[in-house]
């Protein structure tokens, strides 16, 4: 039986509930079935209030609206696999009705998980609620690992209101559109669009692509079956909801994972002449849409920038690579996080010293000493080929 874990982070002089909300928008990426793309699930958790959760696709009458009732301090999983062909956002360069609207009567946590029965290509997409919605985005992406021949990378857009005009300027060629030539689409509420890189090569990924809209949208990044060859083999999915430009930060602390080699950190500027300092040392200056790559071999690093930036961290264990878009230390995610450990593979918590944490498993609790600290903002899973 899969068990839920709740992490309660007690942070002095700090309050942030970046993933605790009553309204979420999400579009699920296409994941290669040949490597493992199912089951797919939503996982929900409540805190001290009961909640009724409604999951719908406003633009798709063929998807049956789902209603879940959770008591306080509860968690439930909604298996979506039966509808996977009207959930995964394919084909690319096509307006589709596959966007999710999730509403709750009280604040909840939510994430989407690809959890293949083969344990071979899983990932978690933490839903960020209002912090995922905006009208201006720059896409962060890794440029070190190629995709497998059957997989692609890209980003996916969902509209939250009717008559949403979205302008996309792809940094590299995507299906149906050349690089550096802006184009616009019009989406209705719940409609989606997939921008997919035409190449599997890492240097043809879409970092620095820009997305703007007249009304709020949400954007999902995906990088399917990244080759872990530099670390000894494997191939794994990475994805996350992108943070809009208006809520980015300029100071980040990153903890190294457990790969057979260094982690990679990708810093993407949204303003010209953005200066980057690594552990207090001025290192580089980049312009808007440009990417600076830092190779992380030490246990931790402090990255500071003169203007807000995106920071994408790729890490994992062994040759299994995953990744996440990081929150700045001004907004370090939620003070409570719930998740399911879906496999019995390697599992670790990276803990920064200085703050007490209460680790609560249903009906059993362990206190992590105050000499420990805060859990990193996203706990990732990786699988095997």
Language-model segment annotations:
Residues 19-351, 355, 361:
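Extracellular lectin-like interaction modules
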Residues 1-22:
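Bacterial Sec-dependent N-terminal signal peptides
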Residues 10-12, 16, 349, 360, ...:
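Generic detector of N-terminal low-structure segments
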Residues 352-354, 358, 363-382:
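Alpha-helix boundary/capping motif
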